[in-house]
Amino acid sequence: MSIEPVSTEVIVGDGLILRGYEWPTRGAPVVLLHDHDDDLDAWHDLDGELATNGFRVINLELRGHGLSDGEADRNTVLSDTEALLKEVKNVWGPIGLCAYGDVAATLCFLDSLCAPTVQIGISPQPSTDKPLDGTQRPDTAYLVMSGTGDKKRTEQARLVFDSLGRNKLWASVASKQQGPELLQKHPHLIGDITLFLQRYLVPAHLDWQKTALDQVISETTPQDSKIKK
C-alpha cells in the first residue's frame, strides 16, 4: 500500500507557522528544507523515496515561501530551523536534516542543543570563499555531497565539509549538476543517503523509542495495568 503525504504545520517563533507535507510512517523523522527562492517541489521525488524506505519525511517551506507564514528573510533561517527541530524532536525523537545550497551551508551552524542526529548537505554553498569557523558537534553525523564537474561549487562544498567535526563523510560524483538535480541525475545517491540514515539515525530513533516505552511502563501503576473481568 502506497504512502500518501498529508498537510502539516510547525509553529516557530512568535507563532509563525511553517507549512508543508508529512509522510506519516512509523520510522525515524527526516526534515527536508529547500533553498532560498525554491519550494517543496524542488526536491523532486526525494521525499517520496525516503518515505518508501520507511522514514517519516517532513518537507517544509521556508518562512515567506509557498504556504508558510511571514516574509522571506535569509537572516531567520537558522533561528526558524532551530525552533522547528525542537518541535519535531519533542514529538518524534532524533532527527535527520537534509538541505542544499545556501541553506545547507547556513544550517551547519545550528545551536548544539537543537542539532539533528544526522545532517545531510547537498552541494552546500557558503557566502564566502574563505575557510569557515569549525563546527564541533560530536553527536551529529554529517554527509556532504557534491558534483565534481563544477569546480567552483565543489570547492565551496569542501569549505563546508572541512569546517565540520570528525564524524563526517564526503560523497561526490563526476557531474555538473548540483542540489536536488544532482540526486535526480544520479539516483544511486539517494541510496547512499538512505544507507547513511539507516546507519546513524535509525539506531538513535530505536533507542529513543525504547526509552519512551520504558518510561511509560515505569509510570504505569498496578491499578492502571489491572485487567477487569
List each language-model region with its residue ranges.
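Conserved alpha/beta-hydrolase
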Residues: 50-69
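Short alpha-helix in the alpha/beta-hydrolase fold that links the catalytic acid
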Residues: 153-163
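N-terminal cap/lid segment of alpha/beta-hydrolase-fold proteins
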Residues: 1-23
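The serine-hydrolase catalytic nucleophile loop
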Residues: 36-47, 156
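Catalytic histidine neighborhood in serine/cysteine hydrolases
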Residues: 164-181
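Alpha/beta-hydrolase active-site loop
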Residues: 71-90
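Short beta-strand/loop motif that positions the catalytic acidic residue
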Residues: 138-139, 144-146
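Primarily recognizes the serine-hydrolase "nucleophile elbow" in alpha/beta-hydrolase
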Residues: 86-138
